[in-house]
């Protein structure tokens, strides 16, 4: 595994983070946010798709990992989040990338050591793990956390003597 694109989906702001993996080392390549400008949901979904297609073209990742949808108190928000995830997943599959998904608890555990970590704790640990000069913005930090979680899951399978492939870990269900 060489380059992982992690995505924290949102209908207004979608975070992305790209890391390169060399052995057990994680190297920061880039991160940021796709901020949608349209009020119309279909236009926002198109902006997410197009933005991720550009990022995939720029970084040429080998793996794609995304945060799993959680149950929100507001059903409308959960549906919009699911649609944003769909746009992101389509961008990945159109580029031929395998898709893996992880829950927020799995991501926080991989980055901070506890699934109940606060956003500020995640940002701080991302800064430390990737040796960044400053903490990334929240959505980008979450996306980097997704990529790190994917890498750690891969490393764990290898350490246990298993054959790691996108088909056997974090796979999309």
From Swiss-Prot:
Its cofactor is Mg(2+). Keywords: Cytoplasm, DNA damage, DNA recombination, DNA repair, DNA-binding, Endonuclease, Hydrolase, Magnesium, Metal-binding, Nuclease. InterPro entries: RNaseH-like_sf (IPR012337), RNaseH_sf (IPR036397), X-over_junc_endoDNase_Mg_BS (IPR020563), X-over_junc_endoDNase_RuvC (IPR002176). Binds 2 Mg(2+) ion per subunit. Mg(2+) 2 binds at residue 67. CDD domains: RuvC (cd16962). Pfam families: RuvC (PF02075). It catalyses: Endonucleolytic cleavage at a junction such as a reciprocal single-stranded crossover between two homologous DNA duplexes (Holliday junction). GO terms for molecular function: crossover junction DNA endonuclease activity; DNA binding; magnesium ion binding. Gene3D superfamilies: Ribonuclease H-like superfamily/Ribonuclease H (3.30.420.10). Mg(2+) 1 binds at residues 8, 139. GO terms for biological process: DNA recombination; DNA repair. Its EC number is 3.1.21.10. The active site is at 8, 67, 139. GO terms for cellular component: cytoplasm; Holliday junction resolvase complex. It is found in: Cytoplasm. The RuvA-RuvB-RuvC complex processes Holliday junction (HJ) DNA during genetic recombination and DNA repair. Endonuclease that resolves HJ intermediates. Cleaves cruciform DNA by making single-stranded nicks across the HJ at symmetrical positions within the homologous arms, yielding a 5'-phosphate and a 3'-hydroxyl group; requires a central core of homology in the junction. The consensus cleavage sequence is 5'-(A/T)TT(C/G)-3'. Cleavage occurs on the 3'-side of the TT dinucleotide at the point of strand exchange. Belongs to the RuvC family. Homodimer which binds Holliday junction (HJ) DNA. The HJ becomes 2-fold symmetrical on binding to RuvC with unstacked arms; it has a different conformation from HJ DNA in complex with RuvA. In the full resolvosome a probable DNA-RuvA(4)-RuvB(12)-RuvC(2) complex forms which resolves the HJ. This is Crossover junction endodeoxyribonuclease RuvC. It comes from Shewanella frigidimarina (strain NCIMB 400).
């Amino acid at each position: 595994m060489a380059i992982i694109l992690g995505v924290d989906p949102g209908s207004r702001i979608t975070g992305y983070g790209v890391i390169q993996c060399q052995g057990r080392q994680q190297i920061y390549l880039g991160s940021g946010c796709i901020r949608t400008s349209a009020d119309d949901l279909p236009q926002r979904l198109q902006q997410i798709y197009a933005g991720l297609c550009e990022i995939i073209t720029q970084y040429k990742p080998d793996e794609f990992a995304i945060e799993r949808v959680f149950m929100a108190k507001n059903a409308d928000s959960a549906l919009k989040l699911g649609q944003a995830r769909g746009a992101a997943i389509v961008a990945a599959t159109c580029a031929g990338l395998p898709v893996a998904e992880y829950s927020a608890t799995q991501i926080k555990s991989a980055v901070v050591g506890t699934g109940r970590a606060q956003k500020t704790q995640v940002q701080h640990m991302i800064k430390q793990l990737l040796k960044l000069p400053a903490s990334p913005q929240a959505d980008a930090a979450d996306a980097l956390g997704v990529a790190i979680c994917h890498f750690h899951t891969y490393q764990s399978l290898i350490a246990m003597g298993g054959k790691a492939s996108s088909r056997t870990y974090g796979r999309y269900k």
